[in-house]
Amino acid sequence: FIAAGMGGGTGTGAAPVVAKIAKETTDALVVGVVTKPFEFEGNRRAKVAEEGIKELRKHCDTLLAIPNERLTVICDEEITTENAFRMADDVLRIGVQSIAEVVTTTGEINTDFADVNAIMRNAGPAWMSIGYGAGEDRAKDAVRQALENPLLDISIEGAKGVLFNIVGGTDLKSVFISP
């Protein structure tokens, strides 16, 4: 995993270099998880971010780019700049952690690295979302929430593959996970 905030010097400059080295020297699955700058950070930073993402995309099997500006849709108008950046960092962490948990957590239907590799190897742009549900309609609510995620700026339409992970309590019934 290569996680970075794009638009500045460090993440934008280092992430493509690290990805290139990983691709050229190993058979690793290279997954980029990055954030794009908030609008208030300016056009120059946005342009630098887009150029960095374009370069990073050349060296990643899969790239998930999250626009920080979309965070304004889900957070309080009174959020401080510091907390907005903290929230952006948390989105990166959740993205990486969720993919890692698919591999490391044993479930009713076991998925492993081979499954993740099959979906993410040479996949290009990625779309990832999480949904939560509770109560009688928890399964429908979780799916709806995941599909309507305001943080994503690309569509699931035209996807080449899907990695779908369901996590529930010990009371999860098979009727909620059967097609």
What are the roles of these predicted feature ranges?
Residues 1-179:
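Tubulin/FtsZ superfamily GTPase core signature
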